Amino acid sequence: MTIGAIIIGDEILSGKRQDKHFAKVVELLWARGMALDWAQYLGDDRMRLTAALAASFASGDIVFSFGGIGVTPDDHTRQAAAAALGTEIVLHPEAEREIRGRFADETTPQRLMLGEFPLGSAIIPNPYNRIPGFSIRRHYFFPGFPVMSWPMLEWVLDTQLAHLHHAVARDEQAIIVYEAPESALLDLMNRITQAYPQASLFSLPSFGGEGVRRHIELGMRGESAAVEQAMAEIRAEVARLGYEWAAR
């Protein structure tokens, strides 16, 4: 199952705010034996959001989307999701109950707009302030505020997607190879990549610096058995080529 993340907001792309969602998604997935396959950053542009969501809905991927589900003029995610699905946004009855429970006599039509989601959506409970997110077609839409979205994401992972936890044993291993150009290891990398499609190879070169030798961090991440076998071959071949290496 392929998992993606969409992080939305002009404030991210302009640098006014630093994204914190990407690292947290990776952390929460890895703790459950899952992995993020792709991520996309988008601004507050309804047409671009609609096109991106149409593509991701068509892919069948599981997608976590952060930001843009409010009701100010720069919030487009709810409408873009509906447009991508060829439907409309409607007030969700469970969302209405949550919003009325939150605001009581101070409930207004504007606040109820926070519960308008694409037709056919389910709500995602928000333990912080009861203003829910929504899910539809394997897509899960959260507010942009981490204090709200991260507990909501954990709820989704542990209730809606619990069957995917540790479905495959995953691991990551790497070695540090000293004073080797990447070109000298390309044949090895290509051979390992072809032999172990259940895992992904990574090569992170460093030019070194004061007190640090030039090196490459060479490793694998993916299914545990494939990682173990691939790393054994990598260590043996690096040694055969005459390069010094150390465990990461």
Describe each region flagged by the PLM.
Residues M1-A39, D44, E228:
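Glycine-rich phosphate/diphosphate-binding loop of Rossmann-like nucleotide-binding domains
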Residues G4, D61-I62, G115, A122, ...:
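Structural motif
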Residues I8-D10, S65-P73, L204, R221-E223:
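Glycine-rich beta-strand-to-loop/alpha-helix junction loops that act as flexible
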Residues V26-A84:
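N-terminal small/polar loop signature for handling phosphorylated ligands or for N-terminal nucleophile
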Residues Y41-D44, E94, L112, A180:
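Short beta->alpha linker loops
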Residues R48-A51, D75-L164:
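Proline/glycine-rich low-complexity loops and linkers
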Residues R138-E237:
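An accessory alpha-helical subdomain
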Residues L201, E237-R248:
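Conserved short beta-strand edge segments in small beta-sheet-based binding/regulatory domains
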